[in-house]
């Protein structure tokens, strides 16, 4: 996969030549239509991969084989990044979504069918050349992406980097509600933390709540040792996948906050925790997203981070994070 995306010149710079500034801006606002129109009929590899992974459009197996000549469509399926679909599903996906976007989130038990792929379909590092049963399919079947995958460019003091980052598909790509364990891609808060983080060389760095692993990828450019933790097994799997795809050495551990690194210390800790404060009135209700809700009342998650970080920091170490905190109505904020 890495060799193919490099050969395809599917980079941020190339993406900006394929799609106009206006269409890219619309895409940031969850509007695919301008980009869909501009890429309609384009056959070069970067355009095919953009339609497939970023816009969420089905593609024919033959088109994916041409875009990824080494891995091929069968290899994508073997890695858990794509699935074969029938003509009916492809036709419905090719129809433009309604202006209203995805349907309203329903109670968990009523929307299991609509949720994103679960752990059984996480991306894998399995060798796509391994033999596997080949079902009888049509000559050139349709395929759909199971994950968002897109290029990301980083200009850092140590040099420029071009990465490809996988995350869960968003509502705009699927037309379906997000699953509770949805792993977010690179959003505005993520970019804010990336920009504010000190990029001096350090011996060790820790990313708490790693999500798709983009903070850890940045840390790996200026830290000799990087550990990434997350309570979500799905987030850990995606971080491991992205580290392998981008040839980064990251020690990924599943667990809550600092529990996976108990007894260890670091020079730099970064965290973009689920800092949205969930009102008590909806606490415990179905449909709370893990990446937004940390599972603790009020701002107790942020309190836990601030109290737990010092024990994991070397002398002179740094903690950089984003946070919200609650100001009770009966307390003077000053």
Regions found by a protein language model. Give the residues of each.
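S-adenosylmethionine-dependent methyltransferases
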Residues: 3-29, 33, 75-78, 83-86, ...
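Conserved SAM-binding motif I beta-strand of class I
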Residues: 225-230
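S-adenosylmethionine
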Residues: 177-189, 199-201, 231-334
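A cross-taxon signal for low-complexity, glycine/charged-rich
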Residues: 101-118, 122-134
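N-terminal accessory segments
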Residues: 1-100, 121, 130-152, 161-163
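SAM-dependent Rossmann-like transferase core, predominantly class I methyltransferases
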Residues: 89-100, 135-205, 210-222
